[in-house]
Each structure stands twice: as structure tokens, then as C-alpha cells.
UniProtKB/Swiss-Prot annotation:
It comes from Campylobacter jejuni subsp. jejuni serotype O:2 (strain ATCC 700819 / NCTC 11168). Pathway: Glycolipid biosynthesis; lipid IV(A) biosynthesis; lipid IV(A) from (3R)-3-hydroxytetradecanoyl-[acyl-carrier-protein] and UDP-N-acetyl-alpha-D-glucosamine: step 6/6. One of its GO terms (biological process) is lipopolysaccharide core region biosynthetic process. NCBIfam families: PRK00652.1-5 (NF001892). ATP binds at residues 63-70. Transfers the gamma-phosphate of ATP to the 4'-position of a tetraacyldisaccharide 1-phosphate intermediate (termed DS-1-P) to form tetraacyldisaccharide 1,4'-bis-phosphate (lipid IVA). The keyword Lipid metabolism applies. One of its GO terms (cellular component) is plasma membrane. Keywords: ATP-binding, Kinase, Lipid A biosynthesis, Lipid biosynthesis, Lipid metabolism, Nucleotide-binding, Transferase. InterPro entries: LpxK. The gene is lpxK. Belongs to the LpxK family. This is Tetraacyldisaccharide 4'-kinase.
């Protein structure tokens, strides 16, 4: 458990707040970053452009890890009717296309969908959720099931799909502008020019979270960049960070509660969907995003193009 925590913190520090030795490592790995960038760029070419007759919106980011894509996708679904979410379904134990939710009915298990897809499935305003490695097939299935708008979670690099690309920029930026493994970027930073809209935190959207202080709670989370929850660390008796998408085990969580003489798990909804059947008392950290007019109006303008 401590290894998981140390691993996550080391990665966060390496990409965002590196010490002297981590900076040295980043420069040593720079040749690999150049090679990675070359193949990443190559992968964006030589594919036929696919155009859909209904709105397709992509919410993505250039950097490694979470920047708030999930709450932003949820925020879009709250603003517009008939939204289906299509995503890869990272860390799911299934392959191919799965309809996770259709018209408010959940149709598969957590292991088939993955944690992010199941989190979307519990969102009332989202009409459908589909996981598919092939995003084109996922989009086609969504429109077949009656979607009015498809929102793609983490599909900025899918340049063969004609879509409205929203690129998220968090207040917390990587220390270096390098691609992996020297930096946190999955594509070279100049690729941000290919976005239709760069959404800046504070200007185009507001991020907020809430949870009541509970001295009888242990905060556990398996999200990318757990330091996003820093304001809530003092609200629990102890905090434990695991790798993104980590599969919690009931016994280890029981041991954590016993160790700190607590009776409640404090976690995000993404974490909750993985432990909800364990029978623990849980306290949810609400993570939400509110769209500002600048972003809301841009999306409305794009959607209206399909109404003509």
C-alpha cells in the first residue's frame, strides 16, 4: 500500500514538481521523448477523415493524467439534451464495444465497463454510455441508439474523426514542455493549435469540490493527480493514494479503517463505483465543473450548425 502511494506521489512530483535528480532524469530520457514524439505525430496522419451528420464533441488534454475531463463531460451533459458518452474504457476487463448504459438503464458490469464509464452511467443527465477501442464504431452505435450529441472522453488525438475539440488546460501545468517520458505531454505542445477551443480553468470553467470534515473517515483515492484533492486531506483522519484505476480490495480497505479506528471511507465517485458492493459506509467527495458563458456559447454555436 505504501508502495502504491509512493509510486503515485513520485510520478506527480516528477511531472509537475521535480526535484534536482528528477530534472536530471528528465534530460537523460530526452532522446526517448524525441522518439516518442516522432511516432505520436506519425500516428496522427494517413487516416481518412470521418464526418458525422450530428454533433460530436471531444473533451481531451495534451498532458498525462486527469485534468478534469470526466466532470467537464458531465457538465456538458447537464447543459444539453440527448448526450451519449463514448470512451475507450481504460482498465476494463473486456474488449470490443459494450453499451454500458442506454436511456437510463445500466446494461453491464463494472469489470466490463471500467470505472470511468460506470461513473458516467450513474449520472442522471447522461442518456447513454458506450465503451469501445474503436471510437468510430462507438459513435455510430450511439447515434443508432438515439443520441442527439456524442461526447468523446479523451479523444483529442483521434484526428481522423471530424469533431469539435475542447482541450483542457488546468491551473497545474507540467514542469517541462516535453513529451513522455521526459515530460507529461502525450503529444507535442504545439498540437494545442489544432484544438477548436482551449478551455482554461477559471476563465472558461470553474472547478469546485465539497465534502464535510469527518474525523472518523479515511480518504482513499485512485485518481490521476490526487493532489487535486489537497484541500480535503485535512478533513479525514488519514489519506491513502493508489495508482489511477486501481482495483480496491475489500480486505485492504477494512485494514485501513481498523488501523485508524475509523468507520467511513471518504472517496470520489469514480472510486465509489468500485467499492459500493463492499458494504462500507462511504462519504463522497463531490467533484464538479461549471461551464462559463465563453465555453457554453461556443458549444451552442457548434451544435446549431447541425440544425440548419
Amino acid at each position: 500500500m505504501n508502495e502504491e502511494k509512493n509510486y503515485e506521489l513520485w510520478l506527480d512530483n516528477y511531472f509537475f514538481k521535480p526535484n534536482f535528480w528528477q530534472k536530471c532524469l528528465a534530460f537523460i530520457l530526452l532522446p526517448l521523448s524525441v522518439l516518442y514524439a516522432f511516432f505520436a505525430i506519425l500516428n496522427t496522419f494517413f487516416r481518412k477523415k470521418i464526418v458525422f451528420k450530428k454533433p460530436v464533441i471531444s473533451v481531451g488534454n495534451l498532458s498525462f493524467g486527469g485534468n478534469g475531463k470526466t466532470p467537464l463531460c458531465k457538465a456538458i451533459a447537464r447543459e444539453f439534451d440527448g448526450v451519449f458518452i463514448v470512451l475507450r474504457g481504460y482498465k476494463r476487463k473486456s474488449k470490443g464495444l459494450f453499451v454500458v448504459k442506454n436511456q437510463n438503464e445500466i446494461l453491464c458490469t463494472l469489470t466490463q465497463s471500467g470505472d470511468e464509464a460506470m461513473e458516467y452511467a450513474f449520472e442522471e443527465n447522461i442518456k447513454g454510455v458506450i465503451v469501445s477501442e474503436d471510437r468510430v464504431k462507438g459513435i455510430e452505435k450511439a447515434f443508432e441508439l438515439g443520441a442527439k450529441i456524442v461526447v468523446l472522453d479523451d479523444a483529442f488525438s483521434k484526428f481522423h474523426i471530424k469533431k469539435f475539440d475542447i482541450l483542457l488546460e488546468s491551473k497545474i501545468k507540467p514542469y517541462f514542455n516535453f513529451t513522455l517520458p521526459s515530460g507529461a505531454y502525450r503529444l507535442p505542445k504545439f498540437y494545442e493549435k489544432r484544438a477548436d477551443f482551449i478551455a482554461l480553468e477559471g476563465r472558461d470553467f470553474v472547478r469546485y469540490s465539497f465534502v464535510k470534515e469527518n474525523p472518523k473517515a479515511v480518504l482513499v483515492t485512485a485518481i490521476a493527480k490526487p493532489f487535486r484533492l489537497y484541500e480535503h486531506f485535512i478533513k479525514a483522519r488519514a489519506c491513502y493514494f493508489f495508482k489511477d484505476h486501481y482495483e480496491f480490495k475489500k480486505e485492504e480497505l477494512e485494514n485501513l479503517l481498523k488501523k485508524h479506528n475509523c468507520d467511513t471511507l471518504m472517496l470520489t465517485f469514480k472510486d465509489f463505483v468500485k467499492v459500493k458492493d463492499f458494504g462500507f459506509k462511504c462519504q463522497i467527495i463531490e467533484l464538479n465543473i461549471e461551464l462559463k458563458d465563453s465555453l457554453r456559447e461556443k458549444i451552442k454555436t457548434y451544435i446549431k450548425e447541425f440544425e440548419q
